[in-house]
């Protein structure tokens, strides 16, 4: 049995940190219905859809993201009015929190909450924790959406140096439609 003990000093301890940087392309073929089997799970409540990398009934399927749409009062949409308002309010409570008066804040275009353009209609994409782990690296997010003959690319340009910290859930970057990230031009 050992009877000799060594005291560890502060210089005897080494701390290392490894950042995992991986690009995860989610191609349009997964969400467009290109494959014969369904990768998109539609729920009876019609509040959101879940997207998988393989047919969702397969044991190999991994959940990639959920997508939903929500709006606040004053929006023109009528289909499932209460459900869509509940989605907006739920996401706003979690992501932007409450005003000092106790009201749910609206999503803000530039993230400042003190004036500016408020988003009344929002599309929410909730990525699986399996994919994003602890965070998406700031300045690396790009989303390209095709609709018919038009295409739009959204990215968090400059977010590694210009991000917001006023969310109850942590840090976030503003999405822009061009590489010129000028104040007040964010899309969400």
In which residue ranges do the predicted regions lie?
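Long, position-biased, composition-driven segments near the start of the mature protein
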Residues: 1-188
């Amino acid at each position: 049995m050992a009877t000799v003990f060594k005291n560890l000093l502060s210089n005897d301890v080494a701390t290392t940190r490894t950042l995992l940087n991986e690009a995860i392309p989610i191609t349009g073929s997964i969400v467009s219905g290109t494959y014969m089997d369904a990768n998109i799970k539609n729920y009876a409540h019609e509040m959101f859809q879940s997207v998988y990398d393989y047919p969702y009934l397969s044991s190999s399927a991994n959940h990639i993201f959920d997508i939903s749409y929500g709006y606040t009062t004053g929006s023109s949409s009528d289909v499932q009015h209460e459900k869509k308002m509940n989605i907006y309010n739920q996401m706003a409570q979690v992501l932007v929190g409450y005003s000092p008066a106790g009201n749910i804040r609206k999503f803000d275009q530039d993230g400042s909450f003190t004036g500016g353009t408020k988003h009344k209609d929002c599309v929410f994409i909730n990525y699986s924790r399996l994919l994003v782990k602890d965070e998406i690296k700031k300045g690396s997010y790009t989303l390209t959406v095709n609709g018919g003959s038009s295409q739009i690319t959204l990215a968090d340009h400059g977010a590694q140096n210009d991000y917001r910290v006023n969310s109850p859930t942590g840090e976030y970057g503003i999405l822009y439609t061009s590489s010129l990230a000028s104040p007040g031009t964010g899309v969400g």
